[in-house]
Amino acid sequence: MQWVEVEVLTTAEAVEAVAVILEDYGATGVVIEDSADLTRKWEDRYGEIYALDPANYPASGVRVRAYLPVVSWQEERAGEIQTRVKALAAVGLDPGAATVRYRLAREEEWAYGWQKYYHPVRVTKGLTIKPTWEEYTPSPGETVIEIDPGMAFGTGTHPTTILSLQALERVLKPGARVVDVGCGTGILALAAAKMGAGAVLALDLDPVAVAVARKNIARNGAADKVTVRNNDLLAGLEGPFDLVVANILAEVILKMIPDAGRVLPAGGTLIASGISRGKAGVVEDALLANGFAVEDTLTSGEWVTFIVRNLLPDPVEC
C-alpha cells in the first residue's frame, strides 16, 4: 500500500492544532521535528541524553509530518490544509510559515520510519524512558520505563511530558492516589507508579490511547497499581485523589479545572502541563479563580507547567 507523506512547517505553539488538522484528513499520528531541539541544552544534571541528527530537523520552526492513505488523497488537500493552518492565527496561535509539502511514500517508510526519532532519554534524576526496540543498560538506582508508542504517540520525550515527569518527581508522595488525565501512552501513570504511588487511574477519551496505555503498563509490570479506562476528563469521578496530573491542551485544562477542584481535597495537588506561554496567563487566572494556589512553575522553551494546590475546604456532607 502506498501513502502520502505530508509535511507542515509551523511553530511550537501551533503543533497540537496542526496535528489535529492532519488527523482530520486521516493521519493516525504525527512526527514532530522541532528545530529548537538542536540548540536546546540536553546535557544537564542528568547527563547526555542522545545525539540529534540535524538532517532530521528543519532549519527553523517546527515540522509536523504525517502519513495519509494515498487512496483518499487529492492534490487540492494540500491547499485546504494550508488554509486551515493559516487560520489558526484567528484563534491566537502563530501558524509560522504554514508551508505544506507532500510526496508519495513507501509502506516501510510509513511503518518504521518514525522509529529513528526515538531513543533512551534520561528525563529526571532517577528516571529514563526507552522505546522497546532500543537496548539500554541502566545505572545503579536508575528506573527505566519501556514504551512502545506505535505510530500514534510519542515515547514521552516531548518537553511538556518531561516537565510533567519532573513535577511528579517533586511532589508525589508514597502511597498517593493519582489520576492521569489524557494518559496517551500511559507514561505519566507509569512514572507515578514507579515513583511510589499507591494507586493510579489513567484516563483517556481515545480508545486507541487506552489500548496502548494498557499494553505499556502490562509490559512494565505495573498492572497491579495502574488502572486504565475510557473517560472524558474527570467527568463522573468521585474522588478523593491526592494528585491529578494532566498533560493536555490549555483549552482542555480550562474545561477540567472545576472538576479537579471537586475530586481533590483541601491540600490536594494538580499538575497542569501542555500549556504554551501565550496561554499560561489565562490558565493561571482560572486556577486562582477556582481556589488553587500556584506553588511552582516549570518552563521549557515555549511550554509551561503549573504545580498548584487546592485551597478550598472539603465539601460538608449534610
Curated annotation (Swiss-Prot):
What is the gene name?
prmA
- List the SUPFAM superfamilies: S-adenosyl-L-methionine-dependent methyltransferases
InterPro entries, A to Z: Ribosomal_L11_MeTrfase_PrmA, Ribosomal_PrmA_MeTrfase, SAM-dependent_MTases_sf
One of the entry's Gene Ontology molecular-function terms is: protein-lysine N-methyltransferase activity
User: Do you know which PANTHER family this protein is assigned to?
Assistant: ELECTRON TRANSFER FLAVOPROTEIN BETA SUBUNIT LYSINE METHYLTRANSFERASE
| S-adenosyl-L-methionine is among the record's keywords | yes
Q: Which GO terms describe its biological process?
A: methylation
Report the protein name in the record. Ribosomal protein L11 methyltransferase
Q: Which Gene3D superfamilies match?
A: Vaccinia Virus protein VP39
Q: Which family does it belong to?
A: Belongs to the methyltransferase superfamily. PrmA family.
Q: Does the keyword S-adenosyl-L-methionine apply?
A: yes
List the cysteine pairs that form cystine.
none
Q: What does this protein do?
A: Methylates ribosomal protein L11.
Q: According to its UniProt record, which reaction does this protein catalyse?
A: L-lysyl-[protein] + 3 S-adenosyl-L-methionine = N(6),N(6),N(6)-trimethyl-L-lysyl-[protein] + 3 S-adenosyl-L-homocysteine + 3 H(+)
User: Mostly located where?
Assistant: cytoplasm
Q: Where would you find this protein in the cell?
A: Cytoplasm
Q: What is its EC number?
A: 2.1.1.-
Keywords, comma-separated and alphabetical: Cytoplasm, Methyltransferase, S-adenosyl-L-methionine, Transferase
Q: Which residues take part in binding S-adenosyl-L-methionine? A: 161, 182, 204, 247
Q: Which residues form the signal peptide?
A: none
